Amino acid sequence: MKIYLVGGAVRDALLGLPVKDKDWVVVGATPQEMLDAGYQQVGRDFPVFLHPQTREEYALARTERKSGSGYTGFTCYAAPDVTLEEDLQRRDLTINALAQDDDGHIVDPYQGRRDLDNRLLRHVSPAFSEDPLRVLRVARFAARYAHLSFRIADETLALMRDMTAAGELEHLTPERVWKETENALTTRNPQVFFQVLRDCGALRVLFPEVDALFGVPAPAKWHPEIDTGIHTLMTLSMAAMLSPNVDVRFATLCHDLGKGLTPKALWPRHHGHGPAGVKLVEQLCQRLRVPNEIRDLAKLVAEFHDLIHTFPILQPKTIVKLFDSIDAWRKPQRVEQIALTSEADVRGRTGFEASDYPQGRWLREAWLVAQAVPTKEVVEAGFKGAEIREELTRRRIAAVANWKERRCPKPEA
């Protein structure tokens, strides 16, 4: 029996990055030998065991053979005669097909170290095309390592295009698509994930609402980048700089979906694109089974982001109504989330990346003022039932009006 550290732990250590999770491959062992050694079996489809002390995963070396459609259509063979090289060959990318033995020696049968040095994401074998989930995984790795200047090998991108054209992505479940997307949204450069999907044709299949934005122009005065798809990815990039929050990043991705519905005759203007985009956000989230909290924020951002931009001319009544509409009284975090997405929208434009966004500060300040109006005083004043809400709203409007007069500059005539 020989045990090897494999995959991401070896890859990240060679890149000088922190190693989070460790996975191990066991060569030359049987399931019974693992059980006798105190390991706990957890794998149903193939033998995976948990170490009795560390609880890290140890998998018996195995091969995989395509036996059906999609990413689940595989037959696994795990036995003592499966070699380490055979196990590594089934992996997606050469940089993930690395192993390390007890002495620290790196086993590299598929030139993974060379590709690490060359910052290249390259598939191990033609079997890559048997698993459509790998299209999303490669896009996610491209986003994860974009800051290290990794790129996808031409032949790998060509294979991803072929897989997409062959309809392989249609076998992916919504849950797996969302999980990969969610993981990609946590990376330093989530916009790269969606750009790669577009490069291989997968964006049109999995995110048609986002893909439809490319080629849709916006007024050059406000959007020097002109193309709404490009603006969307720039905005997502900016959101990633402003917040680690997946909710904020996903909402930013969806903020301009309504522009994809504007008739060409009306281009480059997109009047009413915010409310129009809400249905598309709902459609996308329902299809991918996006968690409700993330979906709800994305819908609110689509509807109200342009309103935030006009903050200096908003009436106090409108500001308080906005807080009502986003349910800020029960979910105050939404004020900060919407301020950040609106800022990302403004700064996600060519030449505006370093722009100040005072509207975000004013929104936060107005919220603190409105929130500070005590409900207790309204009740103690004798108001009852529906009157309480009406009076509380009136006082909030008055407080915001007083603050706005002092703190928020009046727009130029």
UniProtKB/Swiss-Prot annotation:
Q: Return one Gene Ontology term, BP aspect.
A: RNA repair
Q: Tell me the leader sequence span.
A: none
Cofactor(s), names only, from the UniProt record:
Mg(2+); Ni(2+)
Q: For the HD domain, which residue ranges apply?
A: 228-329
* Record's subunit section: Monomer. Can also form homodimers and oligomers.
Source organism of this protein record: Citrobacter koseri (strain ATCC BAA-895 / CDC 4225-83 / SGSC4696)
Example GO molecular function: phosphatase activity
Name-wise, this protein is Multifunctional CCA protein
